């Protein structure tokens, strides 16, 4: 079994680190016999999804865990939905500031996760890890990445 884990490069003027990548980078190379492959993605509306799709074709993992940073959240929050919308308050790392536009002009309004999110949250709680289901991945690059992933899997 191969599990792909992704995190993001620093963004928004923070050149030191992005906690999403720090968490992924700290993972062991194998867990319970599964090979863990790790990639750091660009914080760009278009580039993150394109890079993830390239990696998916190359690595052909059995599972994907895309880790992002949600400022102010004090828990692990698996996402329920990716929406077809880009809007941010800071430019991405290519300098692009989206102020309200679709990710795909003819794409569906949203993609919903098919993961057993409540069971995942319960398992995290049982392990002593704060967790809650998130109903919004926002409208920045994390959302664009999740939308691209769900589109790729559809």
What kind of feature is each model-predicted range?
Residues 138-142:
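Small/polar glycine-rich anion-binding or flexible loop at a beta-alpha turn
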């Amino acid at each position: 079994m191969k599990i792909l884990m992704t995190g993001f490069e620093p963004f928004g003027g923070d050149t030191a680190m992005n906690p999403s990548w720090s968490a992924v980078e700290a993972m062991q190379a194998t867990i319970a016999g599964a090979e863990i492959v790790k990639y750091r993605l660009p914080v760009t509306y278009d580039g993150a999804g394109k890079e993830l799709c390239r990696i998916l074709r190359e690595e052909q993992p059995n599972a994907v865990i895309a880790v992002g940073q949600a400022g102010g959240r004090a828990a692990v929050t698996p996402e329920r939905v990716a929406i077809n919308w880009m809007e941010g308050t800071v430019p991405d790392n290519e300098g692009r500031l989206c102020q309200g536009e679709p990710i795909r002009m003819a794409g569906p309004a949203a993609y919903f996760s098919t993961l057993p999110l409540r069971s995942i949250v319960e398992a995290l709680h049982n392990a002593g890890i704060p967790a809650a289901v998130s109903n919004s991945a926002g409208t920045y690059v994390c959302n664009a990445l999740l939308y691209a992933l769900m589109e790729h899997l559809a």
